[in-house]
């Protein structure tokens, strides 16, 4: 599998090394969050007007999205998973607020902003849907909090 980041082909060989703990890598929302980080990083690297501290803060908040999706997934608890997804959503808000600031200060162009915003919006909606689905699973009791399959009852 390969992703495209600003026209640059990126190898995704790490996806061939699979186990249950790396299952988050199959989530489209995680893949898109990684893509967003790449798009933001490439955009900001082209703009000398953006100071280092602000660039670092934006990249940190953007990277926090995929990191929280992964950490929540790996916790195995639906309650913790949902909590980490909410943290990811908060990081989405922080990232967007900083990007709006850059646009307002004319440190990125409207075209650059729109490109990022479209991807950001898509990820935000996918995160919201994932939270809703997990909350339903939690409420129905359909979540298994263990790596191994539960043993079937013998009759």
What do these predicted regions represent?
Residues 1-155:
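Amphipathic alpha-helical assembly/interaction segments
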């Amino acid at each position: 599998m390969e992703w495209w980041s600003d026209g640059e082909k990126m190898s995704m060989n790490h996806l061939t090394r699979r186990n249950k703990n790396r299952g988050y890598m199959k989530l489209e929302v995680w893949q898109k969050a990684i893509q967003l980080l790449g798009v933001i990083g490439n955009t900001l690297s082209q703009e000398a007007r953006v100071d280092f501290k602000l660039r670092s803060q934006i990249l940190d908040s953007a990277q926090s999205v995929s990191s929280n999706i992964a950490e929540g997934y790996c916790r195995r608890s639906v309650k913790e998973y949902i909590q980490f997804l909410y943290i990811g959503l908060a990081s989405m808000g922080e990232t967007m607020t900083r990007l709006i600031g850059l646009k307002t200060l004319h440190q990125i162009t409207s075209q650059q902003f729109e490109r990022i915003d479209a991807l950001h919006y898509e990820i935000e909606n996918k995160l919201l849907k994932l939270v809703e689905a997990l909350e339903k699973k939690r409420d129905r009791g359909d979540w298994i909090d263990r790596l191994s399959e539960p043993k079937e009852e013998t009759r």
